[in-house]
């Protein structure tokens, strides 16, 4: 019963659309109706930038921090309280799932990158560091957020095998689930990348 309460709480917490809330409150803009219609930092930056570039950067950074924290902080607390790895991984998946399929937005949501990073920094920090380096490099070169995010995700998955080479493949199941969720949410971006229609943001 305790685990079910934790799972429900984490899903509801992960579902909070901080980007949407910040953009509505501070910029009086509904990012669900503009840009990519995503609730993440990239769309916050893209949409708010048209009206107030300085505010756009602040709101985008705040969105990243809050989306990151809503996964990282609960996991840190649960890890400190010595909950087992199975529960921690379930919490990580649910936080990301909540962000991508928010109950408050009729199961729509963001792309899961910041929330995923928040969850994984607690469980697989070296892999997240590797992914972050790739994200920065690809972002600097191509200036395309989705491309940088997908490259970082690929680096994360590959490095999870490199740094944990002695583990059996089925133990990587949560990593595959998380990767699948994020790739699924990026399908429109992937299509635009293929047809060279994706906008530069970074």
From Swiss-Prot:
It is found in: Cell inner membrane. It catalyses: an acyl phosphate + sn-glycerol 3-phosphate = a 1-acyl-sn-glycero-3-phosphate + phosphate. Its main location: membrane. The chain crosses the membrane at residues 3-23, 61-81, 87-107, 118-138, 144-164, 167-187. Disulfide bonds: none annotated. Keywords: Cell inner membrane, Cell membrane, Lipid biosynthesis, Lipid metabolism, Membrane, Phospholipid biosynthesis, Phospholipid metabolism, Transferase, Transmembrane, Transmembrane helix. Its EC number is 2.3.1.275. It comes from the Bacteria. Catalyzes the transfer of an acyl group from acyl-phosphate (acyl-PO(4)) to glycerol-3-phosphate (G3P) to form lysophosphatidic acid (LPA). This enzyme utilizes acyl-phosphate as fatty acyl donor, but not acyl-CoA or acyl-ACP. Probably interacts with PlsX. This is Glycerol-3-phosphate acyltransferase. It comes from Campylobacter jejuni subsp. jejuni serotype O:23/36 (strain 81-176). The lineage of its organism: Bacteria, Pseudomonadati, Campylobacterota, Epsilonproteobacteria, Campylobacterales.
């Amino acid at each position: 019963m305790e685990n079910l309460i934790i799972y429900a709480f984490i899903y509801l917490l992960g579902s909070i659309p901080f980007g949407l809330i910040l953009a509505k409150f501070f910029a009086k803009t509904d990012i669900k109706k503009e840009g990519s219609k995503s609730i993440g930092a990239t769309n916050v930056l893209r949409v708010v930038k048209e009206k107030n570039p300085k505010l756009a950067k602040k709101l985008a950074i705040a969105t990243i921090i809050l989306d990151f924290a809503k996964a990282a902080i609960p996991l840190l607390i649960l890890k400190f309280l010595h909950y087992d790895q199975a529960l921690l991984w379930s919490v990580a998946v649910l936080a990301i799932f909540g962000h991508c399929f928010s109950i408050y937005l009729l199961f729509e949501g963001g792309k899961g990158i910041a929330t995923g990073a928040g969850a994984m920094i607690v469980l697989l920090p070296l892999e997240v560091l590797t992914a972050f380096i790739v994200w920065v490099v690809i972002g600097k070169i191509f200036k395309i957020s989705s491309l940088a995010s997908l490259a970082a995700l690929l680096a994360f998955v590959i490095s999870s095998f490199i740094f944990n080479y002695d583990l059996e493949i089925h133990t990587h199941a949560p990593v595959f689930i998380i990767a699948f969720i994020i790739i699924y949410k990026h399908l429109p971006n992937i299509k635009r990348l293929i047809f060279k229609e994706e906008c530069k943001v970074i």
